[in-house]
């Protein structure tokens, strides 16, 4: 609870790994024999009306837990004048100073490499007064790091959003480090993407999702189970999940709205306040009736990858569009701290 409070109020720069999502409150009842019973009675919401239930809290900088202390110490270097030996970063609304001598020392070099890997695109950072990026710093200071950014999204209009998620470990590419941004998203890829991005989980005693075409050995089986039990996905009339089917825009936007309602009270309030006048708009009427409320709410909250007028409801959702919309939901709800360039 302290972590999500600090995030919402910008009290601190949060460094480490994602917390386990268990945003619940319990009532403790005293029994006659002196023992107590704990009963889960409420879902916990942050000051920004967001629950960490089932998704946890995503730090500003996602780094190996064993290196988090060292990363924090590096960032707390003494303020200094512009210099080629001092890296100045702006994170969480504050300036942080990393000194070259400390960063390249045997004790801190692994942490410095981890810090460079964790930085999102567009993070304000300077060396000797000149704007730089992690790759430039790595070259200038003659040190190595492993970039988490995707190698094939440079020309994507959503490159900043994709790489911001990648820096957080919220999306991954294939074995070659490629994201394949323009490829249509399948239902199997959908559940995998949103489960990883949001950090979703479910209780093992909830069992398997009831779909007849998802084997327990499938690479996406766990993600299907999780998203089904969270009420985010459904099957067809034959009890099938149809994992290889493509997700069209109106299907994805509907699922995005379900994600938003589950995570953020503000999204739920907007969905519940959609008016008949809004539903009657020509750009909304082209959507199927079951997708219109989601389309109105997502558009008004700035969650869509494009203008509503330019979206074909029946066209396939691409991987880059999906990542951009998930990023915008997470940014709107404060689940992640928006990257400067995204």
Regions found by a protein language model. Give the residues of each.
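Phosphate/pyrophosphate-binding loop motifs in nucleotide- or prenyl diphosphate-using proteins
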Residues: 169, 231
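Short low-complexity, flexible loop/linker segments enriched in glycine and/or proline
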Residues: 28-32, 250, 323
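Feature responds to low-complexity, polar/acidic, surface-exposed segments characteristic
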Residues: 119-157, 172-188, 195-222, 234-250, ...
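Short, ordered coil/turn segments that flank beta-strands lining enzyme active or ligand-binding pockets
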Residues: 32, 47-48, 167, 175, ...
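A short amphipathic alpha-helical interaction element
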Residues: 161-166, 190-194, 227, 256, ...
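C-terminal "post-core" interaction segments
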Residues: 1, 5-147
